[in-house]
């Protein structure tokens, strides 16, 4: 107990006063009382390691310094960044000019920055990974989420650290390698679980797993196999794998997982995603660019309920090893947005984020996910300055988006830093997609590691300073790591469930019971997300409903079984769910009770600690005060003893008396204190007894609630008694203090009195010592007497001393004695007090021990009470949960019982309905049977009458019967015919012979027969109606039976629970058999009635009735209640019909009686004599009828043949449709193949473009090499300026032509590609239209098939009816043959009439049939025409498609030819380089020859100079080789600049994307490979004759020579003046004109001495020409413009490209001299002796004017130059 109560290890102070006093603490800390217990108790379940690492939750920042490049080492290697130690860096202010290129300037000289870790430029990728990334990887394996992102300038090495190269891989491939090597056999290879949203997961079905594997294989097919370099495998085999060995990994898993998990069963599923944020829009890098629109699908950033951000529809891919992950990384890098900038060749233009998510799965019988962790590695794009990058267009927009996103990141970090100190501020996470994605990590998802990349170059000083300042603010941001703990809780709550899926998550949300007593436990983390879960459940329910709705009538039994099984499954699932929920509730209650117990124990421990501290402090204060009082008392007593020792006047008896008095007084004073202690001891014993009784009572108690109540009451009483005892103790201690203080005050007063008395005694003693000796005896005797008197009085004996005899002396002595007695009493009282104090201390220690024991007993009792209370609460909660469960079960049982009752009621109602319907069916069948029997009886009676009556009447009656039976709907016609029959009978000639009486009788007889037949017709009509009603009832019965079956299925589930349902099922089966029997009987009867009732003429009516019936049945299906009402009405109608039938039966009986009478009357008139003539006529009519029947048979045969033909045609159409469908499928397959081919072609086209760009880059690199070579050549080729200018001119023309050709080809290819895309889209639309037309054709054909089937059925029906009529006709023939002897002529007339009517009806039916056939044939023709048109359209589209395919093939061939041409051009470039090397060697040999010739010419010049002094002025115009040599040297110096400018131009064109050729490239004009293309203008001049120039046009066969005047030489004084002016001008020119570095001009020492002379000073005469005549001077002044000025005019009127190039040449000719002047400024103060140089104004000195405006003198006469200008102007008018 004490170890728990005192965790700091401080010994608990004892309450014994005799123990040594403990040193009192200086300050008492009461902050523990004011602690926020809710905050501390929320961390009870968390790990102690997490609490210990709470101080490490700040954002970790690591710095990596990029080493210098080769160019930076040469120019910027000042060392601005200096690494002090492993955690600090010093940034120095650069002293060079490059460091201050920006407008800002730092005021500090050096600044120090500290980081979590600093990695210098010499650190390798492996060391950086070990020092910075290894710990987050370990945390990932332990189940935590981490974020790592790089930050820095562009070109600072972020992507290199992130990805690395193939030789030296970066942190991302290394993390993958370490991850998979540490997991090894613990990988979960199945794809049953997939990550979802931020921290969730989905359970996949088998089909979904197949889809995931197919998607993965398609992704891996897009990129080839990637081989990782050996360094990465060294990493795996070396230190990294040792750092994460398998036992350590298992220990980490043990530490991070729950206690219930088995470490051997835990496996890991690794999933990977890769996306980028480009221009504030998110793209998945695993998804390639779509081939149709060249666009990528944008993804949406969203948040879950807890505010954690995730990317919707992001593709997650499961990875099984590091190679697959590396291949996916390469695939994403291939799709990443990268561009070329001035500072970086491959600058990433987006923020790319590679995420690794690990699912920890317990691989048991039912696998479940225990934890989800992720590692996000973000490669941020670098911040850029547009001044330095010089971006334009799309690059500038990208840079703006990158800078804004980084700026918002800085804002968010600054706000997070400030919000810790001040109030909570709004963090602008939503201002950019990057910060919105990082929001979840900044708000507690996981720790963050930030990698700062900087460069050491001086030019980026300001940017590095800003980056380092940003890193200092980022280090102060606190990042909470709350997701791991909440995730542990969430996954621990789901531990007991077997299936951790979406359903379980939903159950968690629905039944997540919270405890009200602990309010701080209700946090947002326990709220589960169920948006997608509810959607999935709704979808499942919808699919189940759809499946139940789409059941057929044929599969009734299977449906019943399925429903029974589903109901059983549902019940089982519900029971399992209830059990799981019960277990979960019990577990949660246990956990919460344990939490409450822990909380209460901690509270009680803290309270007891606080109380013990208070008691110890109080006792220490008392001890301290007592010690002070005792010290003061001892000091005063010592003083008093000293005083008393000096006084010897008093005796010992007085002291004794005083002691006795003091003892008595002190005893009286301390009686109260001893009584208090005794009473306290009695109270303690009473408390002990009460505690023992309470304990016994608690043990004896049975009801825990009553026991707890009693204990609480007694506990309160004990507390009150303890408080009273404490108050009494405090009062007693106060009284003791007061009494001691009073006694001390009295002692002080007495001591002061004693002092005064001692002083007075001393004075008296001195006086008495002077008294005489004789008086001593007397005083001695008197003293003895006094002593005796005192002894007699009972006083103690006095001390020896002198006593005055006088009465005042005796009084003083008495006072002294009293004082001595009082002092002795005080001393004895002190001694007694000390003894009593010791006794009291001993008693207090005993009481304190007893109090401690009592406290311990009380604590134990409190614990028992708390445990009992907890048990009570637990049992109450159990009871409540059980009650809730019981209530739920009872409610479910009640609902089930109610459903059973409702279903029973429904079943009973249905049974009643079935019984009623069966009764109605029985009654209807009986009525029908009775009617049929009555009709049969009537027919027999009529036959008897016929046998009695004449054969003519019998034939009439038979015909009428047949006619009535055949035509049920045409009753009126039959009545008319029956009415016309008697008229016809009596109109005949042979009837007139009979008497009038017989006529009247016959009329009455016929009338009665007609009435009978009318009644029979009505009966037949009623029977037909009843048959229709019976059909409707049958259909309704069928529907009701379907419903009954559904209800039976539901009832079967409930009857399975009950034992009484078996008998009912048997009854239902019996009833079903009865109903089936009734159906069969009804069907037979209905067939018999339909055969009698239906006719050929009623086809259309039957069709209309059928359509009406269909609509009626649909309406009846929708409204069952209306059907029930109609059934009731029909039952009533049946009753009415039965009554009418009974009435008619009575009428028939009456008629039968009348018939009998008529038969008796007409027996005499049966036999006649004219039967022979009637028989002849009857035979003739029979022959006619036979002929007619033969014709009808032929017609029917023809119709049957036509039907067969139509069937054959329909079969053909079906076959054609099948063929068309097969063709369409083939076409679809071809289209898919063609689309794949197009996609492959596009990829090849993109690869070709990339290859072209690579070739262009190689060309630019080769141009750089050519530049270096040219610099070397230019040092040797100082005399080849004119030749190089010619080459430049030719090169420009070649470039123009080639650019035009390349642009035209590219435009044509692009146009063709666009056309192909458009054609493909049009074809796709046409194919879709074709599909629609085919679907419509199929529908129409199906409708036609239906119509044909209906018509074929009608034809069959007609054929059956014809057969029946034939049979009837045969019967008639037989009857007629039998009754030939009894027939009459009137019967023949009637038969002819009836036969004519039948013929008319047959003709009408044939006409209708023909009209229907015509309509059908027309529809068939229309359909055939439509099908033919569709086939034609499809053929056309197929042809177009074939043509487009041929075009695509052609385009592909052209692309291949272009690639072949590129390869040829590369080979030609190599050939040209070889030729160039050969030319260089040839030029070197020529230069040597020229140098030797120049030496020879110098000698000749010296000779000529000697001769020139003697010669005339005309000889001055001759050529001087020495200045030409110098001029040629100057020109050679100038040559480097135009070439460099040409290189700059070629670079610029290469950057724009067009192919740029160099000045010496090979041209392939007219197929023959020539060194240079055909020039537009050829200019030839040699350094030997610089004043002559040969110009040749393409049309002219011979060149035209042009003479150029020479400039005169200057004197030495003028040369010096010109030098000074040139220096002034060069110093005045701005610095910005310098374009080339100094290193380019170090190797030209001749240029340092060249000075430019511009203006009129260049027109002065040289010293060598001083002797020339005035004529030559005038000629020189007239020809002031030199060759270069004329050359500028010549180029001004040339084509625009030549003008622009000429401008750059003229500008560059001035710039290098200025740069040389700057370099040689230091040497200006000490100029060397300049050699005598011959300056020329025309060629060597550059003109400081613009390229467009060239000044020249106006000349009246048109020179040869102007003629050339005009010609060139007209030629370049294009």
From Swiss-Prot:
Tissue/organ expression: Expressed in the brain (at protein level).
Coiled-coil region(s): 525-601, 705-747, 824-946, 1021-1507
Biased composition (Polar residues): 741-778
Bias (Acidic residues) ranges: 538-555
The keyword Transcription regulation is assigned to this record: no
Domain Kinesin motor: 58-477
Compositional bias of kind Basic and acidic residues: 779-788, 1638-1651
Compartment annotation: Nucleus; Cytoplasm, Cytoskeleton; Cytoplasm, Cytoskeleton, Microtubule organizing center, Centrosome; Nucleus, Nucleolus
Main location: nucleus
Keywords assigned by UniProt, alphabetized: ATP-binding, Cell cycle, Cell division, Cell projection, Coiled coil, Cytoplasm, Cytoskeleton, Microtubule, Mitosis, Motor protein, Nucleotide-binding, Nucleus, Oncogene, Phosphoprotein
Pfam families recorded: Kinesin (PF00225)
Post-translational modification: Phosphorylated during mitosis by CDK1.
GO CC aspect terms: centrosome; ciliary basal body; contractile ring; cytosol; growth cone; intercellular bridge; microtubule; microtubule cytoskeleton
InterPro entries: KIF11-like, Kinesin_motor_CS, Kinesin_motor_dom, Kinesin_motor_dom_sf, P-loop_NTPase
Sites of Phosphothreonine modification: 1598
Positions of the UniProt region annotated as Interaction with PIN1: 1514-1774
Binding site for ATP: 152-159
Example GO BP: neural tube closure
PANTHER family: KINESIN FAMILY MEMBER 20B, KINESIN-LIKE PROTEIN KIF11
Function text: Plus-end-directed motor enzyme that is required for completion of cytokinesis. Required for proper midbody organization and abscission in polarized cortical stem cells. Plays a role in the regulation of neuronal polarization by mediating the transport of specific cargos. Participates in the mobilization of SHTN1 and in the accumulation of PIP3 in the growth cone of primary hippocampal neurons in a tubulin and actin-dependent manner.
Family membership: Belongs to the TRAFAC class myosin-kinesin ATPase superfamily. Kinesin family.
Designated name of the protein: Kinesin-like protein KIF20B
Organism expressing this protein natively: Mus musculus (Mouse)
Gene giving rise to this polypeptide: Kif20b
